[in-house]
Amino acid sequence: MSDNNKKLIIFDVDGVIFKSQFLLCLSRNSGILSYIRAWYLCFLFSINYLSMRILLEKVFIRVKGLKEEDLWQLYCKTKMVANAEKTIQEINNSGHYVALISSGVPDILMKDLAEKLDAGCGYGIDVKIDSGFCTGEIGGLLSYSDGKLQVVEILL
């Protein structure tokens, strides 16, 4: 297949590669009240009452102090949909480029996921970690509502 026929295939991770929403799994790990609050915030986001940025800030401030090691353990426990790896491999074998994008999964985890699944790249939100602990601060293009569009434009 020539480069002219090579296509960029983009997968969102939450609910597509991962069976569930990483933000909710992260909140559940912080206790039932954090989970209920995160679920409610996700609902408000889904009806356009909250922006992406505010949703992420409110969820990640609740996990301030979480050990980076615990973040990795939660990621490792997150279940993927059946055949995710096989599907990406078949797309790669067809000569296409696979990108993984998420506004709810930290970038360090997305890079690892892309490597595990043999995707071309992975992009997530920037979660500040200082001395091995989450500070509750977030950043990066994907922490904003139009962030996915901006990342796609960069990839093109």
Q: Model-predicted segments: where are they?
A:
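Broad structural signal for hydrophobic residues in well-ordered alpha-helices, predominantly aliphatic
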Residues: 26, 59-60, 113, 155
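C-terminal cap/substrate-recognition subdomain and adjoining C-terminal extension
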Residues: 2-8, 76-156
